Amino acid sequence: MTIQGNIRVLEMSANVRVTQGTLEILGDEAIFEYDANSNELTKVTVHGTPVRFQQQLDEDGALVIGTSDTLLFYSDELDETILELVGNANIESPDSTMRCEAIIYISDRDLIREAAGPCQGMLSSQPN
């Protein structure tokens, strides 16, 4: 563990698993960043060949799954859970499939906020 300014950094390697609720992220190594004053987890960066994630969307067991070279996991200013998939990014949900160089996904809303191309795939509107 190291301290860099106001951030405490913990690095883990070899078959890393990160879970929060129904979200599960698997990778080769992970970097956990904590606020040094509050000890609050602020960001997790996972690297892999590839990084894999899955999350149960609803009580019926529907899953969203994805892969990428790197995945960043954090909460944004609206306190929404964000997954940034970077490098060979792929997301599949019951109604959508997308492959891009990078994808920013809001897991709380099953919503792709941004995608950097080239991209290919199919997105369907989902009722809220």
Per-region residue spans from a language model:
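Mature-chain termini and adjacent capping regions
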Residues: M1-N128
